[in-house]
Amino acid sequence: MSDTVVASAAVQAPAKTVKSPKAAKTTKVPKAKKPVAHPPYINMVTAAINGLKERKGSSKIAILKYITKNYNVGDQIIKINARLRDTLNKGVVSKALVQSVGTGASGRFRVTEKKAAAAKKPVAKKAATGEKKAKKPVAQKAATGEKKAKKTTATKTKKTADKVKKVKSPKKIAKPTAKKVAKSPAKKSAPKKAAAAKPAKKAVAPKT
């Protein structure tokens, strides 16, 4: 009986599993982006259209061939084709490209002409200069009007001042006449006193 009990206990006891040590967490280092060996797709598309010089515009296939020959785009043609389709659609929306024939990416494309935009700019500048010229004479006229008004007021004040002086001038003339009449008898009496004093000095001299 003891043997059977020991055997059953040995069967029931589960074997202990040894835990493996946890691996240290490795921090993911972000991969450095490789520098792109080609310019942006919109620049390559415009260069392809200008290089092909087709009157009706260039097709997507022709543009793709030009890009793969002249630029280091890679060998994944499916991705290149998808990127090219997106850039063509975005170029039409942003008006950088004009779709001359067809719809979507299956048509023909041309670069928008910049001459029309350059021709419109001088017209706006001329209009602005015309407005400036119109504003300057108005300001000058207003300034001249103010100057004339100031001159007229100044002349009026001068005339009134002259009138006041003319009214006051006769009073000044009357004063000197009265002073001359008062001083004239005093001057005549002075020489008589001097004549009377001279003979007195001559009489004192012989006594010494």
UniProtKB/Swiss-Prot annotation:
<keyword id="KW-0238">DNA-binding</keyword>
<dbReference type="InterPro" id="IPR036390">
    <property type="entry name" value="WH_DNA-bd_sf"/>
</dbReference>
<keyword id="KW-0539">Nucleus</keyword>
<dbReference type="GO" id="GO:0031492">
    <property type="term" value="F:nucleosomal DNA binding"/>
</dbReference>
<dbReference type="InterPro" id="IPR036388">
    <property type="entry name" value="WH-like_DNA-bd_sf"/>
</dbReference>
<feature type="region of interest" description="Disordered">
    <location>
        <begin position="113"/>
        <end position="208"/>
    </location>
</feature>
<comment type="similarity">
    <text>Belongs to the histone H1/H5 family.</text>
</comment>
<feature type="compositionally biased region" description="Basic residues">
    <location>
        <begin position="165"/>
        <end position="191"/>
    </location>
</feature>
<dbReference type="GO" id="GO:0000786">
    <property type="term" value="C:nucleosome"/>
</dbReference>
<dbReference type="GO" id="GO:0045910">
    <property type="term" value="P:negative regulation of DNA recombination"/>
</dbReference>
<feature type="compositionally biased region" description="Low complexity">
    <location>
        <begin position="192"/>
        <end position="208"/>
    </location>
</feature>
<dbReference type="InterPro" id="IPR005819">
    <property type="entry name" value="H1/H5"/>
</dbReference>
<feature type="modified residue" description="N-acetylserine">
    <location>
        <position position="2"/>
    </location>
</feature>
<dbReference type="InterPro" id="IPR005818">
    <property type="entry name" value="Histone_H1/H5_H15"/>
</dbReference>
<feature type="compositionally biased region" description="Basic residues">
    <location>
        <begin position="148"/>
        <end position="158"/>
    </location>
</feature>
<protein>
    <recommendedName>
        <fullName>Histone H1.3</fullName>
    </recommendedName>
</protein>
<dbReference type="Pfam" id="PF00538">
    <property type="entry name" value="Linker_histone"/>
</dbReference>
<keyword id="KW-0158">Chromosome</keyword>
<dbReference type="GO" id="GO:0003690">
    <property type="term" value="F:double-stranded DNA binding"/>
</dbReference>
<keyword id="KW-0007">Acetylation</keyword>
<dbReference type="GO" id="GO:0030527">
    <property type="term" value="F:structural constituent of chromatin"/>
</dbReference>
<comment type="function">
    <text>Histones H1 are necessary for the condensation of nucleosome chains into higher-order structures.</text>
</comment>
<dbReference type="GO" id="GO:0006334">
    <property type="term" value="P:nucleosome assembly"/>
</dbReference>
<feature type="domain" description="H15">
    <location>
        <begin position="37"/>
        <end position="113"/>
    </location>
</feature>
<dbReference type="GO" id="GO:0005634">
    <property type="term" value="C:nucleus"/>
</dbReference>
<dbReference type="GO" id="GO:0030261">
    <property type="term" value="P:chromosome condensation"/>
</dbReference>
